[in-house]
Amino acid sequence: GAGDQGIMFGYACNETREYMPATLILSHVILKELAVIRREGQVMTYLRPDAKSQVTIEYDEQTHRPLRVHTIVVSTQHDEFILPGDGLTEKEAEERMQAAIREDVRTILIPRVKARLERAGDKLAGLIGDDYILHVNPTGKFVIGGPHGDTGLTGRKIIVDTYGGRGAHGGGAFSGKDSSLSLIHISEPT
């Protein structure tokens, strides 16, 4: 088969206990906490399973150490919980819905992410201040998600599924793979 060749990249860094980039770990924690909130069903009850996140960190130019979270992007699938009608146009309903999601991400999700990191004794919690830029569903309403929203196995999200923008990537996607074929090889530098 086609599993006899490929370019694989991998690296470790000392930004986190997991030896992965802080941006990636923070994105993962955001998505894990978002899933917990959705499963609890107490707040943000409009949440649906499809979501993605990106975190940008400002680094010290001399030491290359993380200074602070600069930007957080959260795109999350949701119900249409505010509908047009009763004097609301479709545009007004969508704007109110997006404003409510944005407010909930800022006041519910991000504080819970920070608390989760603090409980774990993770130094990444200290990077999340109050001065970050927040983008929530920046492309607008996100009602259709999952396979219906991203049809086809075209290798979407290969960078976000690995190291983010911090490392090289061989180009292979994780979707649509024969599970017997190699996806990741780890080798020590020569």
Label the model's feature ranges.
Residues G1-I144:
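Glycine-rich, mobile lid/loop segments that gate access to catalytic sites or pores
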Residues A12-T16, P147-G149, I158, S179:
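Short capping/connector residues at structural and topological boundaries
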Residues V113, G164-G167, S187:
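Alpha-helix capping/termination and helix-coil
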Residues G149-S175:
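A glycine-rich, aromatic-flanked flexible loop/lid motif
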Residues G176-L183:
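Active-site pocket-shaping loop/turn-to-helix segments
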